[in-house]
Amino acid sequence: MAGHSKWANIKHKKAKEDAKRGKIFTKIIRELVSATKQGDPDPESNPRLRAAVEKALSANMTKDTIKRAIERGAGNSDGGEMDELTYEGYGVGGVAVLVETMTDNVNRTVSEVRHAFTKFSGNLGTAGSVAYLFTKRGEIIFDDVSLEDEIMLVALDAGAVDIENDGESLLVITEPDTFGAVKDALDAAGYESSNAEVTMSPSTTALIDNIDDAEKVMKMIDMLEDLDDVQDVHTNVDFTDDVLAQLG
């Protein structure tokens, strides 16, 4: 996808900053609990849980905290019920946005999400309004493009769908249910990824070519991600090189 690397790099940078501030811990714990409730408490047989555990470890969460979250999800400790809901809408410039939430108060969550869209000239839409623009898939990113041939052999043999090279990074694409197996194979072969996740990938992008709109989009995304109930934000935004440079 054109522009993937640019947006992926921004997301990766933001994730590191979020981890430093500590706010990502609450979101990871919720994901650990939810993934356990919806599947096996053993990460080896639950790809979603395994991905959540890897995210937790990369954020330097202690194994004891991870264990307690899994036990809570398995019903071995107290914890209130959480609803998982996805909201859809548009930002300025026709940028499509998917907001994944986990909440114990739906009214509070929808109000906060709508406020973030409205504050930065966006619109919260109805179910299905932008979801069709995204496909769920696994993405594993490597920074060393010189390893393309070696990584391709291992990834495709393990069940990867495709590999993209934009000159700055390699993107290994998988089906959601084979993500864990492909990542395990690459890890076992000694290839360390810079980012790996099952995400919602856009089929088309909305190109932003002016800094004013770009800042509105980024501020809206930041505000959404800062909400306690929001687990993840997916968008089809892309930026021209000039705008990207101005964003820093």
Swiss-Prot record:
Gene Ontology BP annotations: regulation of DNA-templated transcription
Subcellular location per the Swiss-Prot or TrEMBL entry: Cytoplasm
Pfam families (UniProt xref): TACO1_YebC_N (PF20772), Transcrip_reg (PF01709)
Top-rank lineage group of the source organism: Bacteria
Broad class of where this protein is predominantly found: cytoplasm
Molecular function via GO: DNA binding
InterPro entries given in the database record: Integrase-like_N (IPR017856), TACO1_YebC-like_2nd/3rd_dom (IPR048300), TACO1_YebC_N (IPR049083), Transcrip_reg_TACO1-like (IPR002876), Transcrip_reg_TACO1-like_dom3 (IPR026564), YebC-like (IPR029072)
Key words of the record: Cytoplasm, DNA-binding, Transcription, Transcription regulation
GO cellular component terms attached to this protein's record: cytosol
Family named by the database record: Belongs to the TACO1 family.
Name recorded for this polypeptide: Probable transcriptional regulatory protein PsycPRwf_1013
Origin species: Psychrobacter sp. (strain PRwf-1)
